[in-house]
């Protein structure tokens, strides 16, 4: 049976009905009467008696003539008596009460008329939505057929009859103090009015199917069926078959009561046929009906009592009183399913009344509802529909079928005018893209329908400039939350994108908040970018601004260059440019750029400077085909400045206040738009300033798209024969074939309309130009950065990451150039900003393009140990941490020696001409310091608050660059960089800072710091000094890639020169010749340059050695004794050795030399030595010439005192030298020891040495004479300081050498007990130090 498609139109507006409040004034009050006291009641009578008595007295006394003055006093008493009697009488007169009562009753009469008018409107509205069943026959084919949609308030509400209902308007009486005081007649009239008018009788009342899952109906069978027919008639008249389905199970299916259902399209089973056409959900067996409905019921969720717009509602009627519904699958409530069961079993007395499963009884023309314990009136006059009337209605509806595009994308307001129907698209899943993108006339370009007007006509949105007949170029849209602003924006975008290729239109969607709907357009070929969530990622807002400025500049330059080429002068607008193309000039097309700035007021709140940007782009964009649609929830005139003045068309959706509505569309209509989801997308369009607002509703495009259903089955009869049309299924004849194609066309998963269209458009035509590059959000692997940079090897340039330049619409490599003035670099960043990782990238990138002989790195790791991962790289000479002070000092020693060596070679700078590197094996050398703050706080004390090595770093920064020595540092604070160093750091990169106020990056005229836009959660992201965002590449240091091993494999046998360390045991032969001349002994190796340390006793004959036990004091004495003895004779050298602990007892001395361990021998030995040395002074009386030629005769005498702190410095208490101190004879000779041939060497413990230097006369004199001092290992906490230097825990034989120079020197003393020839700096040798 073929049917006509019924095209539903906009629903007719029902009669208006108010649901406000009528406030009724309270009745008048009567004052309360309080009885007076006995005295007050008696006092007037007493005064009257007094007056009469006075008059009698006057007459009795003979005063015949009474003067007025005499009568004054009685008159006053009379007035007082009257006042006492009437003054406090609060009783109202009867006339006053009657008058107020009459006024109030007249007032109630007016109120009654108003209430009746409201009640009449309510009844008329109810009768409009729910007319009498007898009127339903006239509805089919009219505009009202199938008028209800899921968003209508009366959707699935079926009229059951007439009943007394509450008045929709609230009646409220003003508060009164107490009802006792009210005037009784007025009060009674008010109560009567309220009791009568608060309800309306005989009003159509319905049953909401969305709120009930099962209805059980009892009563006489004929009446019950008549009632159910009325319900079904109401349902099928007002509801489209796509939103409502009807199913019936009845024993007498072919009888008059139910046979008429077969004509209704609501009972058809989609995709199934029988011998007569569409199969029907009609059966004589409830179980068979359940089997037919099985696929429909299977996936439905449980019943919740809430509307289910996405599901087709099923009304299932089971007319079988004997069927046990509770034991069937229909007993379980399902969403979008209502089961009506005709039952014969009355509920038992204690049965609970379930509001979701009501039990109704039809009796005496009324309907009662079961409440726990008994029946209660439900419908006063139940509707009944005869079988003939139902058959007549069904036959009238049978000729119509629903529009297949009804479901899904058709809203209640636009009705059949969906997105596809407005654009003339039959099936959005099979678009004819070439036809949609076909060239248009200029007046039709950028002109698309986006909804329907209040009269049902398509609303055309014309984006062109008003000079070309459009509404543009710029517009303003305001709509509060829930107004459908996003829905309207998506409708505009989808209409434009579907009908225009990327050669004619490109789009930038900028959403400051980050709505999910914007992402739906990300894959469209015309969409340049969807920029969302700019509130959290402030850098995106900056990129958006730069992109707009850059596109304006790009189009301006393109018009200028093309105009000069074509006509000799620049084109003034894109229109002139297109005219040149039409004239035959070969020019690339310039598409219109449509910018949607959603939530732009929030953007201006955070970035007020962008108001000038929008104003600039809006003014320039008119000629350059850059159109902007500003959208927001509210309008803050103070923030948007002149933006609204640059807009031509206005769109006002539901707004929060009348004032905002007036600002947008000129009237308050946008404020009066009703709230609720059924009114989303309703608004007013003002196409030009001063134009009349046009009410419209945008199409809904964000729903699931269901393609038009094609016939799934075909009936082919070999010999056509007429058949009787019955309600039950009709089996086909043997010669009839039903071909089912369900399996040939599997159903695709549900997809939204936007995604369905976007996928098809992406396969056609060109894509939009890449005006917006992806932001620096994704990690850049170092391998990718190397490939993109295109830097060749041996150029001493390498990429570090990428710089984002949205204004130029490109991303450039961040390249370090070692040969430029920016050869020194500082990376400034806060905690966890990626500083250490940036250094890893720096080193690995350089190593990937250069050999270890071309670049080498020496690292000081104060940043957490990340540089330690590169210590095995062939290009890395050393990685030293804060726990390796010796390696740090040696690193500076190596670099300073390298600098000195290169300074002495004049040809070093000439290497740049041919790209050659110096032949010293280092190449370009980089000192890398991770965390300058930690480095500057290391090796400090209370007198030196900063690391002394900082001065050496500054020297390398300012001098080393010219000699191929570079300094790369990171710091958490720019203040940690010394002033003298800052100018030498040519490349400054700033990562995320803890406080943006510490940033050194500034933009002239900007209201905020660029550092505010650097993301918090992206290490490696930062700014150049030009305020350009960059991102360091990731070094890819993982077990799988292992770049260190891969790079080392490319340079086998090559490595950067390592940092040489002092040996832990220094053999005598490792330093060459030990005796360099008279009194010149090599005692060790210097840390600074690993050169031999020569002890020149001729220049300074005094030597102090301090150190704790087994630090090497005695070993040094042993070396000195052996070296001097092996290179001298007894006539030239003599020794006096004081050795309390017998450590030097086995060292052979010359004959007659003094060796003593006895304390008693010290004083005579010192006296004898003093006499010997005193005798070497020149005799008295010599002339000046004789003195100049005079020298003493004799040997050089070495006085060696081991452990001088063990020798008591107190006077002798007994013996021949009583009162004599041991060192007193010697102290006077120390100042001239060098001239008199005396060499004094003393050793002592480190602990307490600082105290001894102040208390011991001998050591104090040594210190005064600036004796050479060696500080071996000692406890820094207990040993104090010597000449400002503190002891340190050093290995055996390691000492700090203090001379008359400015800085101390670390040395390794020779161990004469080591037999090996030489010990390398990294190898531990066996040997002992004592």
Swiss-Prot record:
Keywords attached to this entry: ATP-binding, Cell inner membrane, Cell membrane, Membrane, Nucleotide-binding, Repeat, Transmembrane, Transmembrane helix, Transport
What Pfam families does the database record attribute to this sequence?
FtsK_SpoIIIE
Q: Where is the signal peptide?
A: none
> What Gene3D superfamilies would the database entry show?
P-loop containing nucleotide triphosphate hydrolases
Domain FtsK residue range list: 456-662, 811-1000, 1090-1280
What SUPFAM superfamilies is this protein classified in? P-loop containing nucleoside triphosphate hydrolases
Mostly located where?
membrane
The UniProt annotation places ATP binding at 479-486, 829-836, 1107-1114
Q: How does it sit in the membrane?
A: Multi-pass membrane protein
Q: What is the superkingdom listed in this entry's lineage?
A: Bacteria
Q: Tell me the subunit arrangement.
A: Part of the ESX-3 / type VII secretion system (T7SS), which is composed of cytosolic and membrane components. The ESX-3 membrane complex is composed of EccB3, EccC3, EccD3 and EccE3.
Question: What's the protein called, per UniProt?
Answer: ESX-3 secretion system protein EccC3
**Origin species:** Mycobacterium tuberculosis (strain CDC 1551 / Oshkosh)
Query: Which gene specifies this protein's sequence?
Result: eccC3
């Amino acid at each position: 049976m073929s049917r006509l498609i019924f095209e539903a139109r906009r629903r007719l507006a029902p009669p208006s009905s108010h649901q406000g409040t009528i406030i009724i004034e309270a009745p008048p009050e009567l004052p309360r009467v309080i009885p007076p006291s006995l005295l007050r009641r008696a006092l007037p009578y007493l005064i009257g008696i007094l007056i009469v008595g006075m008059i009698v007295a006057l007459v009795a006394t003979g005063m015949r003539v009474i003067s007025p003055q005499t009568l004054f006093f009685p008159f006053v008493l009379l007035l007082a008596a009257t006042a006492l009697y009437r003054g406090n009488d609060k009783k109202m007169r009867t006339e006053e009460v009657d008058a107020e009562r009459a006024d109030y009753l007249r007032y109630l009469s007016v109120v009654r008329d108003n209430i009746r008018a409201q009640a009449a409107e309510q009844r008329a509205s109810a009768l409009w939505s729910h007319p009498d069943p007898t009127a339903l026959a006239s509805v089919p084919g009219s505009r009202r057929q199938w008028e209800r949609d899921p968003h209508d308030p009366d959707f699935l509400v079926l009229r059951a009859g007439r009943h007394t209902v509450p008045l929709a308007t609230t009646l409220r009486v003003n508060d009164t103090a107490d009802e006792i005081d009210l005037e009784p007649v007025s009060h009674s009239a008010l109560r009567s009015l309220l009791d009568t008018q608060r309800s309306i009788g005989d009003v159509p009342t319905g049953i909401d199917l969305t709120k009930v899952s099962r209805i059980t109906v009892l009563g006489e069978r004929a009446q019950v069926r008549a009632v159910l027919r009325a319900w079904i008639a109401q349902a099928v008249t007002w509801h489209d078959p796509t939103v409502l389905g009807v199913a019936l199970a009845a024993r007498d299916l072919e009888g008059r009561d139910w046979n008429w259902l077969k004509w209704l399209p609501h009972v058809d089973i989609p995709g199934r046929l029988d011998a007569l056409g569409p199969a029907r959900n009609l059966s004589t067996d409830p179980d068979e009906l359940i089997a037919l409905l099985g696929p429909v019921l299977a996936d439905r969720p449980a019943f919740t009592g809430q509307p289910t717009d996405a599901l087709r509602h099923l009304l299932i009627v089971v007319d079988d009183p004997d069927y046990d519904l509770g034991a069937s699958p229909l007993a379980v409530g399902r969403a979008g399913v209502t089961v009506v069961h005709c039952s014969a079993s009355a509920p038992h007395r204690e049965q609970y009344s379930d509001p979701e499963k009501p039990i109704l009884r039809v009796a005496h023309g009324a309907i009662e509802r079961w409440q726990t314990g008994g029946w209660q009136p439900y419908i006063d006059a139940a509707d009944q529909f005869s079988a003939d009337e139902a058959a007549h209605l069904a036959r009238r509806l049978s000729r119509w079928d629903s529009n297949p595009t009804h479901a899904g994308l058709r809203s209640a307001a636009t009705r059949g005018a969906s997105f596809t129907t407005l654009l003339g698209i039959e099936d959005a899943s099979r678009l004819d893209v070439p036809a949609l993108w076909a060239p248009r006339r200029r007046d039709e370009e950028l002109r698309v329908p986006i909804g329907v007007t209040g009269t049902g006509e398509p609303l055309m949105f014309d984006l062109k400039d008003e000079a070309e007949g459009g509404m543009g170029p710029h517009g303003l849209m305001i709509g509060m939350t829930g107004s459908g602003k996003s829905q309207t924006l998506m409708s505009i975008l989808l209409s434009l994108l579907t009908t225009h290729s990327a050669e004619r239109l490109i789009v930038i969607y900028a959403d400051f908040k980050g709505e999910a709907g914007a992402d739906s357009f990300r894959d469209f070929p015309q969409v340049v970018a969807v920029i969302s969530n700019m509130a959290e990622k402030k850098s995106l807002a900056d990129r958006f601004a730069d992109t707009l400025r850059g596109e304006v500049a790009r189009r301006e330059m393109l018009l200028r260059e093309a105009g000069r080429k074509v006509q000799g002068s620049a084109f003034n607008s894109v229109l002139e440019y297109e005219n040149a193309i039409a004239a035959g000039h070969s020019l690339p097309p310039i598409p219109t750029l449509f910018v949607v700035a959603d939530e732009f007021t929030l953007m201006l709140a955070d970035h007020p400077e962008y108001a000038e940007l929008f104003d600039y782009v809006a003014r320039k964009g008119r000629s350059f085909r850059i159109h902007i649609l500003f959208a927001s929830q509210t309008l803050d005139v103070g923030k948007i400045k002149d933006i609204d003045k640059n807009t031509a068309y206005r769109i006002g959706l539901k707004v929060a206040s009348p004032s905002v509505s007036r600002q947008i569309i000129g009237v308050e209509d946008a404020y009066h738009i009703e709230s609720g989801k059924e009114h989303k997308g309703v608004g007013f369009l003002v196409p030009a300033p001063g134009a009349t607002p046009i009410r419209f509703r945008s199409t809904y495009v964000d729903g699931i798209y269901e393609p038009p259903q094609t016939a799934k089955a075909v009936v082919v009869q070999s010999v056509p024969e007429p058949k009787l049309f019955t309600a039950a299924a009709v089996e086909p004849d043997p010669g009839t074939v039903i071909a089912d194609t369900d399996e040939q066309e599997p159903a695709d998963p549900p997809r939204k309309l936007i995604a369905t269209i976007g996928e098809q458009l992406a396969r056609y035509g060109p894509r939009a130009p890449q005006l917006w590059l992806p932001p620096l959000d994704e990690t850049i692997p170092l391998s990718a950065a190397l490939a993109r940079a295109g830097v060749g090897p041996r150029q001493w340039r390498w990429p570090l990451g990428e710089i984002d330049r949205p204004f130029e619409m490109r991303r450039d490599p961040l390249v370090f150039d070692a040969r430029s003035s920016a050869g020194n670099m500082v990376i400034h960043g806060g905690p966890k900003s990626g500083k250490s990782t940036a250094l890893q990238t720096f080193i690995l990138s350089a190593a990937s393009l250069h050999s270890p002989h071309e670049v080498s790195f020496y690292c000081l790791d104060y940043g957490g140990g990340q540089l330690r991962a590169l210590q095995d790289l062939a290009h890395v000479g050393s990685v030293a941490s804060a726990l390796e002070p010796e390696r740090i000092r040696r690193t500076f020693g190596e670099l300073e020696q390298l600098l000195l060596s290169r300074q002495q070679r004049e040809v070093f700078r000439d290497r740049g001409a041919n790209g050659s590197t110096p032949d010293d094996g280092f190449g370009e050398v980089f000192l890398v310091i991770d965390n300058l703050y930690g480095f500057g706080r290391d090796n400090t004390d209370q007198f030196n608050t900063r690391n002394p090595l900082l001065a050496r770093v500054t020297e390398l920064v300012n001098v080393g660059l010219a000699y191929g020595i570079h300094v790369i540092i990171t710091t958490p604070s720019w203040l940690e960089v010394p002033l003298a160093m800052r100018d030498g750091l040519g490349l400054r990169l700033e990562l995320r800072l803890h406080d943006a106020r510490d940033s050194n990056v500034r933009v002239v005229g900007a209201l905020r710091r660029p550092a505010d836009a650097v993301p918090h959660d992206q290490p490696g992201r930062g700014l150049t000094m030009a305020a350009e965002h960059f991102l360091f590449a990731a070094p890819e240091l993982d077990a799988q890639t292992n770049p260190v091993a891969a790079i080392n494999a490319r340079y086998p046998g090559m490595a950067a020169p390592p940092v040489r360390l002092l040996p832990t045991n220094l053999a005598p032969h490792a330093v060459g010749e030990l005796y360099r001349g008279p009194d010149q002994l090599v005692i060790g190796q210097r840390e600074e340059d690993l050169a031999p340390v020569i002890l020149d006793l001729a220049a300074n004959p005094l030597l102090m050695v301090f150190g704790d036990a087994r630090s090497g004091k005695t070993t040094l004495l042993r070396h000195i004794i052996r070296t001097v003895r092996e290179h001298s004779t007894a006539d030239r050298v003599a020794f006096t050795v004081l050795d309390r602990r017998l450590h030097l007892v086995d060292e052979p001395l010359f004959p007659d030399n003094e060796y003593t361990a006895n304390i008693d021998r010290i004083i005579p030995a010192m006296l004898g030595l003093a006499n010997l040395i005193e005798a070497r002074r020149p005799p008295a009386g010599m002339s000046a010439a004789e003195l100049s030629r005079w020298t003493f005769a004799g040997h050089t005498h070495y006085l060696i005192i081991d452990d001088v702190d063990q020798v008591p410095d107190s006077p002798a208490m007994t013996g021949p030298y009583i009162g004599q101190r041991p060192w007193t004879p010697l102290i006077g000779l120390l100042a001239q020891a060098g001239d008199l041939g005396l060499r004094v060497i003393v050793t002592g413990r480190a602990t307490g040495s600082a105290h001894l230097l102040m208390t011991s006369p001998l050591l104090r004199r040594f210190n005064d004479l600036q004796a050479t001092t060696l500080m071996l290992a000692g406890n820094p906490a207990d040993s104090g300081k010597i000449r400002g230097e503190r002891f340190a825990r050093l290995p055996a034989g390691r000492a700090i050498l203090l001379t008359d120079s400015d800085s101390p020197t670390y040395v390794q003393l020779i161990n004469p007990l080591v037999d090996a020839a030489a010990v390398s700096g990294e190898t531990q040798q066996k040997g002992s130090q004592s």
